[in-house]
From Swiss-Prot:
Catalytic reactions on record: cytidine(1402) in 16S rRNA + S-adenosyl-L-methionine = N(4)-methylcytidine(1402) in 16S rRNA + S-adenosyl-L-homocysteine + H(+)
HAMAP family noted in UniProt: 16SrRNA_methyltr_H
Organism per entry: Listeria monocytogenes serotype 4b (strain CLIP80459)
Name of the molecule in the record: Ribosomal RNA small subunit methyltransferase H
Function summary: Specifically methylates the N4 position of cytidine in position 1402 (C1402) of 16S rRNA.
Length: 312
């Protein structure tokens, strides 16, 4: 069964200030926890569009949300294509959008999906099982320099060069097929004292490959930029991030959106067209409570940022 602990459930949805008759988007359906809570706040005129590129997530959500079937539309697509998918359905503007950028726990835990460094499986890591690029292709075919780049940029891995060099050495002998083989390579490449600190030695490398396979950061940036153009005045976007890379992108985009155009010097009054279109609804990110952390350790690195389109 598709089980997933929803992080910052009430905070994320409540910060959208849901209107009962509004149109909302869950950009990352996953285990449907946020969707269920949001649907509960909508009347018969309200509607939710729920996106996921994983068919398993959609199939399970249809069962979980069966009582709300007339209020929800499921769309199998990457959230970077959200605006186009909504426009195709006649939706030009919405009242709120939420993102939970954590990988769904069920995907991490399904052995055959090849996300986990705890279980041996084929190197896969695709969110969308229909796409061609897999972790196996990245590990076996990408250049030494490209591997260093993704391990350093996406994994913030100090031993990027050593790991890339060991991958290169091993794949010359035979293709690297499984997550278990990759874990063994990482453990060989990282010096013993460093291996004993800071959690599993494969964590950063696996994160980097997963981000590369799914172009996660590019998708986040594209999607958020489009999401800002979809908001009605007074509408809000809630974004939960789980690592510094996504949080940096979200923070930067939100800050840029709240600036407004450059002002000509010497204006006594600021004309409306020079006032910003957006304001931050969260000056500092909202983080999980101690109580939530006790129940769900995966929430530890979660941060929630919210932006609002200003009514002029």
């Amino acid at each position: 069964m598709f089980k997933h602990e929803t992080v910052l459930l009430h905070e994320t949805v409540d910060m959208l200030e849901v209107k009962p008759d509004g149109i909302y988007v869950d950009a990352t359906l996953g285990g449907a926890g946020h969707s269920e809570y949001l649907l509960n706040k909508l009347n018969e005129k309200g509607h939710l569009f729920a996106f996921d590129q994983d068919q398993t997530a959609i199939d399970n959500a249809k069962i979980k949300l069966a009582d709300y079937s007339d209020k929800v539309t499921f769309i199998k697509a990457n959230f970077r294509d959200m605006k186009e998918a909504l426009n195709e359905r006649g939706i030009e503007a919405v009242d709120g959008i939420l993102y939970d950028l954590g990988v769904s726990s069920p995907q991490l835990d399904e052995r055959e999906r090849g996300f986990s460094y705890h279980q041996d499986a084929a190197l896969d890591m695709r969110m969308d099982q229909e796409q061609e690029l897999t972790a196996k292709i990245v590990v076996n075919e990408w250049s030494y320099q490209d591997l260093i780049r993704i391990f350093f940029q996406y994994g913030e891995e100090k031993f990027s060069k050593q790991i890339a060099r060991e991958i290169e050495r091993r794949r010359e002998v035979k293709p690297i097929e499984t997550t278990g083989e990759l874990v063994d390579i990482i453990k060989t490449a990282i010096p013993a004292p460093a291996r004993r600190k800071g959690g599993h030695p494969g964590k950063r490398t696996f994160q980097a490959i997963r981000i590369a396979v799914n172009d996660e950061l590019g998708a986040v940036e594209d999607s958020l930029e489009k999401a800002l153009t979809l908001l009605k005045p007074g509408g809000r976007i809630s974004v939960i991030t789980f690592h510094s890379l996504e949080d940096r992108i979200t923070k930067h985009l939100f800050q840029e959106a709240t600036k407004g155009p450059d002002l000509p010097p010497g204006l006594p009054v600021i004309p409306d067209e020079y006032k910003p279109d957006f304001k931050l609804a969260t000056r500092k990110p909202i983080v999980p409570s101690e109580e939530e952390l006790e129940q769900n350790n995966r929430a530890r690195s979660a941060k929630l940022r919210v932006i609002e389109k200003i009514i002029k």
